[in-house]
């Protein structure tokens, strides 16, 4: 929830500048769309062709960030006030939920065969709980539905005991699963890609791409 508010706050850049002067360390907030582009570039480079339609879905406590990519290029990016903590507090409005669903359904019509790239600690934990065999990083939506059906009826303590979850994961994992299932239904997706790639890896990869591009441009001029 903190990152969501930092990205929206007008005074964030001023605050980061002041802290940079105090510490000598320059800080920068990466926009959700840029984060999605970095992670998607890294994912498609390591797993498959960049051709195709992807929905990068990052579920947080305060919001769900959805970035839509077509053939490796960012088409549009949206932020919805639908997060795990908001859902637990009953603070998600039907209007916000419907707005997200309508946007996704429209994208599915315009770009059929869209694949979901799931991001965040909850979807990674759900993937591990699913115990997918082999090297696949794809979580079938049917498996997620089954896992949700097992988790949802349990108390917080039962989830912690039976599924070895920490208390701060055992509560938010339920609304997180609900959000991903809602997104999958709206996009008519049967699988969710859960890459084992961190944002730090993707930033380094992005810097490498920039350096390679600058070197190639310099060579062409010479």
Regions inferred by a protein language model and the residue ranges of each:
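A short acidic Gly-Thr/Ser loop motif
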Residues: 57-63, 119-122
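Helical "lid/coupling" subdomains associated with nucleotide-phosphate turnover
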Residues: 3-53, 68-222
């Amino acid at each position: 929830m903190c990152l969501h508010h930092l990205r929206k706050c007008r005074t964030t850049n001023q605050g980061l500048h002041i802290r940079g002067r105090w510490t000598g360390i320059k800080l920068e907030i990466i926009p959700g769309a840029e984060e999605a582009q970095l992670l998607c570039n890294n994912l498609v480079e390591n797993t498959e062709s960049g051709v195709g339609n992807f929905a990068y879905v990052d579920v947080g406590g305060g919001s769900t960030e959805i970035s839509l990519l077509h053939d490796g290029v960012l088409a549009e990016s949206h932020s919805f006030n639908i997060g795990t903590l908001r859902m637990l507090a009953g603070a998600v409005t039907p209007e916000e939920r419907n707005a997200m669903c309508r946007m996704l359904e429209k994208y599915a019509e315009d770009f059929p065969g869209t694949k979901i790239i799931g991001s965040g600690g909850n979807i990674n934990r759900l993937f591990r709980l699913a115990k997918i065999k082999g090297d696949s990083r794809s979580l079938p939506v049917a498996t997620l539905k089954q896992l949700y059906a097992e988790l949802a009826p349990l108390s917080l303590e039962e989830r912690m005991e039976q599924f070895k979850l920490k208390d701060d994961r055992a509560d938010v994992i339920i609304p997180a699963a609900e959000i991903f299932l809602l997104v999958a239904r709206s996009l008519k997706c049967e699988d969710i890609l859960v890459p084992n790639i961190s944002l730090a890896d993707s930033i380094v990869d992005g810097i490498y791409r920039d350096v390679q591009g600058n070197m190639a441009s310099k060579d062409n001029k010479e």
